[in-house]
């Protein structure tokens, strides 16, 4: 397959490098177009009011294009200008940190995969729960990368449906210690925001965002629940934000006309 590979942690991130190596190892042609800098939390944003620039990075075991922009910029530029033809698959990741439940709205990793899905391309977002307290920061991600590539190869993409993203999350442990893969819905639980206030040397306040998803609000069998229990999770995502139940209710209110 011809695979477009991107992420939101930047072109030098070890998760992307692991997926690159695993894809090449499996015999695929890989086109890397990824942000030059950290872009976590930018969601599906894109650059509008300034030009998008890029630079080619060539290393002994790696070749890619670094984009001074968002993950969505990377996918749009790759498909619209840089790639010689449409890829067979777009993979985004491996992200440092899980993307489950409400995370998907903020995630640049999922944002890039969504952009590809909007272009009718098979699309997969891959994340590793690296922010868990018991996860070694230097953990080798090649086993997860190989597993994700194998999933992409085995996936019946025609049965997945149009404009869908396959969202994969790996638990905070070595792959051989993970529980089995579960296909599951995302949790509807939301983050409880906590901002830590500090002062700069001039006495002006600034804030760091922290917080958590309250455990009691996480539905059993959801992506967050299963990931917390050590399972690999697979959740199909679609991005029709229309509330169809609400649509029917509003039509009954006779507001039109």
Curated annotation (Swiss-Prot):
Gene3D superfamilies: Survival protein SurE-like phosphatase/nucleotidase
Matching InterPro entries: SurE (IPR030048), SurE-like_Pase/nucleotidase (IPR002828), SurE-like_sf (IPR036523)
Cofactor note: Binds 1 divalent metal cation per subunit.
Cofactor(s) it depends on: a divalent metal cation
Localization in the cell: Cytoplasm
Recorded catalytic activity of this chain's protein: a ribonucleoside 5'-phosphate + H2O = a ribonucleoside + phosphate
GO molecular-function term, one example from the UniProt record: 5'-nucleotidase activity
Any one annotated GO CC term: cytoplasm
Metal-binding keyword on record: yes
Keyword field contains RNA-binding: no
Swiss-Prot/TrEMBL keywords: Cytoplasm, Hydrolase, Metal-binding, Nucleotide-binding
Signal peptide: none
EC code: 3.1.3.5
Coiled-coil region: none
Positions that bind a divalent metal cation: 8-9, 40, 95
NCBIfam families: PRK00346.1-4, surE
Function: Nucleotidase that shows phosphatase activity on nucleoside 5'-monophosphates.
Entry's family note: Belongs to the SurE nucleotidase family.
Entry-linked PANTHER family: 5'-NUCLEOTIDASE SURE (PTHR30457), PHOSPHATASE, PUTATIVE (AFU_ORTHOLOGUE AFUA_4G01070)-RELATED (PTHR30457:SF0)
Protein name according to UniProt: 5'-nucleotidase SurE
Organism per entry: Desulfovibrio desulfuricans (strain ATCC 27774 / DSM 6949 / MB)
Lineage of producing organism: Bacteria, Pseudomonadati, Thermodesulfobacteriota, Desulfovibrionia, Desulfovibrionales
């Amino acid at each position: 397959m011809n695979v477009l590979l991107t992420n939101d942690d930047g072109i030098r991130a070890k998760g992307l490098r692991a997926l690159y190596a695993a894809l090449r190892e499996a015999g695929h042609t890989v086109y890397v177009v990824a942000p030059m800098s950290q872009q976590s939390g930018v969601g599906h944003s894109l650059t509008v009011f300034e030009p998008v620039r890029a630079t080619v990075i060539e290393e002994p075991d790696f070749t890619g294009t670094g984009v001074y922009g968002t993950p969505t910029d990377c996918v749009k530029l790759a498909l619209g200008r840089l790639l010689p033809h449409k890829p067979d698959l777009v993979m985004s990741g491996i992200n440092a940190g899980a993307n489950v439940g409400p995370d998907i709205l903020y995630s640049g990793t999922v944002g890039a995969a969504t952009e590809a899905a909007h272009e009718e391309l098979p699309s997969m977002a891959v994340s590793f729960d690296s922010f868990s307290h018991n996860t070694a920061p230097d953990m080798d991600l090649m086993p997860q990368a190989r597993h994700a590539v194998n999933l992409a190869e085995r996936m019946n993409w025609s049965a997945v449906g149009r404009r869908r993203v396959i969202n994969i999350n790996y638990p905070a442990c070595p792959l051989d210690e993970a529980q089995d893969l579960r296909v599951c819905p995302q949790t509807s639980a939301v983050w409880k925001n906590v901002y830590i206030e500090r002062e700069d040397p001039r006495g002006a306040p600034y804030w760091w965002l922290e917080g958590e998803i309250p455990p009691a609000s996480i539905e059993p069998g959801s992506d967050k629940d299963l990931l917390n229990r050590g399972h690999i999770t697979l959740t199909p995502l679609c991005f029709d934000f229309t509330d169809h139940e609400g649509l029917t209710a509003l039509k009954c209110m006779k507001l039109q006309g």
